[in-house]
């Protein structure tokens, strides 16, 4: 890897460490609840007529949705594979017996230096966030070491960057039919061939209108904010 690549990788890994603190600080208290139906834990599926080329055929797992806006991770835009050891080498850390590669995804156009690991719920750290009862997310360099040491979750999706919407922006885009809504089936999130994810998700969409979303609390939708910005 080039010197430039190592510097960028080091910056990305450092962002993992910073992100851990941000995720924990952003968690709501036990009495907080969404004021309206939340899409947290569901999939956004870009309509075939999506006008934004950044989201053409994109499938996005929504991890936060509330009055302040929404945050999601694109799950079907792989950008390559990276040796797990390189994340630690870039920071000058001992990588021990960490072996193997991890597939890396572009999670969205916002802050691509930030890393997120979406994973199955069989793994948990203090900073882990439950998106649903079948999907979790951890933003910590420690999870990469555990994956390399064969102590990590059974299913993993590592993404850098995210998609973000301001207040009422996502609702408006859904009303304009830019997005369909589908269940976040873990098989679709982790196992389906990435070239097929959009086709399968589009066929499975259950709502095309925000107004059609059942007014029930979705598991994990109490997450009011994943990121805090200065």
Residues of each region from the PLM?
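A short aromatic-anchored loop/beta-hairpin motif
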Residues: 25-230
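Bacterial N-terminal signal peptides
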Residues: 10-19
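Bacterial N-terminal signal peptides that target proteins for export
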Residues: 1-10
């Amino acid at each position: 890897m080039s010197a430039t690549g190592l510097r960028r990788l080091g910056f990305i890994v450092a962002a993992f460490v910073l992100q851990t603190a941000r995720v924990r600080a952003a968690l709501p208290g036990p009495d907080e609840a969404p004021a309206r139906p939340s899409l947290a834990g569901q999939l956004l599926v870009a309509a075939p007529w999506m006008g934004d080329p950044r989201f053409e055929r994109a499938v996005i797992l929504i991890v936060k949705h509330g009055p302040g806006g929404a945050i999601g991770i694109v799950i079907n835009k792989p950008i390559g594979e990276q040796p797990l050891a390189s994340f630690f080498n870039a920071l000058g850390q001992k990588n021990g017996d960490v072996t193997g590669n991890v597939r890396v995804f572009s999670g969205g156009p916002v802050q691509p230096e930030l890393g997120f690991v979406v994973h199955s719920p069989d793994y948990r750290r203090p900073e882990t966030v439950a998106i649903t009862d079948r999907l979790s997310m951890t933003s910590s360099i420690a999870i990469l070491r555990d994956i390399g040491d064969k102590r990590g979750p059974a299913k993993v999706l590592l993404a850098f960057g995210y998609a973000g919407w301001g207040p009422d922006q996502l609702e408006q885009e859904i009303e304009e039919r830019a997005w369909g809504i589908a269940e976040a089936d873990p098989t679709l999130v982790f196992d389906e061939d990435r070239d097929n994810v959009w086709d399968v998700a589009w066929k499975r969409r259950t709502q095309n209108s925000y107004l059609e979303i059942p007014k029930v609390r979705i598991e994990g939708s109490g997450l009011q904010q994943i990121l805090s910005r200065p």
